[in-house]
């Protein structure tokens, strides 16, 4: 597991490919302006994993983010978070977020809205998130996603 741990601010930033080729992300602790560059490095690692999984599984990149340990999130790291969500729009990816509380949930909702991402959902449990990530699109949803042929 690739892990960046900073004891000073008690932050943990993890990114790894796990079972089912799901990209598992963990963000925990105080995400402060002082730790901005550590957060940027982590988002770059996530982008690399998304690219790799997109090459391995075109059209089916899955991410599961555990954020229940986030106790503080300052303004400066919001920029690379927004850039990460924008970057991932170019890939057919589903992202599930688990454990967001109060202000973290509001922050995520805002960033999701600002980036116009429709394939990110927040869940209370990892089990609920995995069920959603692994569900196949319905026939109706598949037809909505199919290219329209010229008449």
Predicted regions and their residues:
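Amphipathic, Lys/Arg-enriched alpha-helical "gate/interface" segment within cytosolic domains
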Residues: 1-151
């Amino acid at each position: 597991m690739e892990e960046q741990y900073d004891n000073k601010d008690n932050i943990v930033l993890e990114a790894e490919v796990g079972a089912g080729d799901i990209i598992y992300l963990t963000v925990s602790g105080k995400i402060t302006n002082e730790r901005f560059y550590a957060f940027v490095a982590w988002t770059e690692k996530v982008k690399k994993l998304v690219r790799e999984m997109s090459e391995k599984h075109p059209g089916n990149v899955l991410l599961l983010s555990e954020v229940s340990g986030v106790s503080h999130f300052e303004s400066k790291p919001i920029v690379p978070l927004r850039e990460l969500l924008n970057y991932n729009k170019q890939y057919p990816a589903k992202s599930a977020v688990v454990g967001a509380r109060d202000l973290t949930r509001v922050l995520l909702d805002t960033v999701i809205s600002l980036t116009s991402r429709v394939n990110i959902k927040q869940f209370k449990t990892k089990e609920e998130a995995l069920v959603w990530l692994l569900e196949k699109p319905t026939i109706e949803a598949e037809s909505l996603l199919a290219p329209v042929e010229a008449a």
